[in-house]
Amino acid sequence: MSKVTFKITLTSDPRLPYKVLSVPESTPFTAVLKFAAEEFKVPAATGAIITNDGIGINPAQTAGNVFLKHGSELRIIPRDRVGGGHQPRM
């Protein structure tokens, strides 16, 4: 079985630490997200993986599909940082 390798960078840390993960192509991407979140001590339930261009990745696919669509360099961010806008005051 072939493997795919991802370089996942933690964007919420100014030092931009990264992890390199190699997983079988058929691995559910939710498992990759969960493992990367645990490695960076970010809660998996509140983390999101995006491309270097800022495009969010739907984790409901295989690691092989993500690799083919988005390449190997990805970023993990806490979801409280997703969006870019601020909440208007009421």
UniProtKB/Swiss-Prot annotation:
Its main location: nucleus. It comes from Danio rerio (Zebrafish). It is found in: Nucleus; Cytoplasm. Keywords: Cytoplasm, Isopeptide bond, Nucleus, Ubl conjugation, Ubl conjugation pathway. Belongs to the UFM1 family. The keyword Transcription does not apply. Residues 84-90 form a propeptide. There is a cross-link at residue 69 (Glycyl lysine isopeptide (Lys-Gly) (interchain with G-Cter in UFM1)). GO terms for biological process: protein K69-linked ufmylation; protein ufmylation; response to endoplasmic reticulum stress; reticulophagy. This is Ubiquitin-fold modifier 1. Disulfide bonds: none annotated.
